[in-house]
Design a protein with these regions (language model features):
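Structured, non-membrane catalytic/scaffold regions adjacent to prosthetic-group chemistry
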Residues: 2-346
């Protein structure tokens, strides 16, 4: 089916994506269709807050004491290009499993995906002296609407600290997996903030503003916060993609596969357990893509019968995925380990 004409990559591939809502468009990747390190645009999850706009081909930049200037897509393309492999995860990924339920899109575990993003490092768009006196940089998208509990029309906008915005891998991107960014993924220009939850990677980028005080807008103070603190780095998580939850498997030797990621540091180990006892562990080798998920594979021998498998991610800084969810009012950063239940038939 077509989702109101927005799906630039063609018809919504229902075998790959589960559409939660059509307007605004929210769709997650089916776990059994997560294959390979790089997720094609048509299989990558989509998160929108309002109707999908036609993104502008230029970005307006405003400084406190500077005359506004516009930078066009073609001008950005002429800047030194940089390609970064980035895992983006919606902050609400896993919300569906909270009990009692909390408000928000009821994502399973498919609101995550990895792509190769190409663009210009943000810091190359403006001279360094523009940042004098700035404490944050605000990024506004072309998408606008009325949040249910706000009652007035606003644009989607988020700010970044100066040090994060100036990182080499923070991009104003114009390509996804080597092609122009599809409309549903924020093209033609999108901010990419590696290692942070996806809310920071503002889509349909329309305006950049240098601020002399912290931003306190709706999507910074009322949404994407836990106990008043705006969300930042992605928490560690491992997800089993094979075997599927509820599957019957044949033979006692079983390969367990999946993905693991963290926005604090690359994942270095995945533990597989059952009933509190470790079945197997794998140490992942060093990787040249620090902002991307890691594929893992573990082989275990299981007796016939029912089994409950749990995968846990541990990153290089020692951050460990919790076994239980950490509850908060809107169900953000719920990275509690999820059980995969299978039946082994000998």
């Amino acid at each position: 089916m077509l989702v109101r004409g927005h799906w630039q990559t063609g018809r919504v591939p229902e075998r790959d994506l589960l559409v939660l809502t059509e307007e605004p468009l929210n769709a997650e990747t089916r776990l059994d269709r997560q294959r390979g390190r790089i997720v094609p645009a048509g299989r990558h999850y989509v998160r929108t807050h309002f109707a999908i706009p036609v993104g502008p081909p230029e970005v307006l930049i405003k400084g406190a004491a500077r005359a506004p200037r516009s930078v066009t897509l073609e001008e950005i393309r002429r800047l030194p290009p940089r390609t970064v492999t980035v895992t983006l995860e919606c902050a609400g990924n896993g919300r569906r499993f909270l009990d009692p339920p909390v408000p928000g899109e009821q994502w399973g575990l498919g609101a995550v995906g990895t792509a190769e993003w190409t663009g210009a490092s943000f810091h190359s768009l403006l001279p360094g002296d523009w940042l004098h006196g700035a404490v944050e940089i605000l990024f506004r998208g072309a998408d606008e609407g009325v949040p249910k509990d706000l009652g007035r029309r606003i644009a989607y906008e988020r700010s970044l600290p100066i040090d994060i915005a100036r990182g080499d891998d923070t991009l104003v991107a114009y390509a996804m997996n080597g092609e122009g960014i599809p409309r549903e993924h924020g093209g033609p220009l999108r901010l990419i903030v590696p290692s942070w939850y996806g809310m920071a990677s503002v889509k349909w980028l329309a305006e950049i503003r240098l601020l002399d005080r912290p931003f306190d807008g709706f999507f910074q103070q009322d949404r994407y916060v836990i106990e008043g603190a705006p969300l930042r780095n992605i928490e560690p998580r491992a997800v089993i993609t094979s075997p599927a939850d509820g599957a019957d498997v044949y033979g006692r030797s079983l390969e367990v596969r999946g993905y693991a990621w963290s926005g604090h540091a690359p994942v270095e180990r995945v533990d597989l357990s059952e009933g509190g006892g470790t079945l197997a562990s794998t140490t992942l080798p060093a990787d040249t893509a620090p902002h991307a998920w890691r594929e893992f594979s573990l082989r275990v021998a299981l007796d016939p019968g029912e089994h409950v498998l749990i995968a846990q991610a541990i990153d290089r800084k020692g951050n460990t995925q919790p076994l239980s969810p950490r509850r908060n009012a809107l169900g953000y950063a719920n990275n509690g380990a999820r059980a995969t239940r299978i039946r082994v038939r000998g």
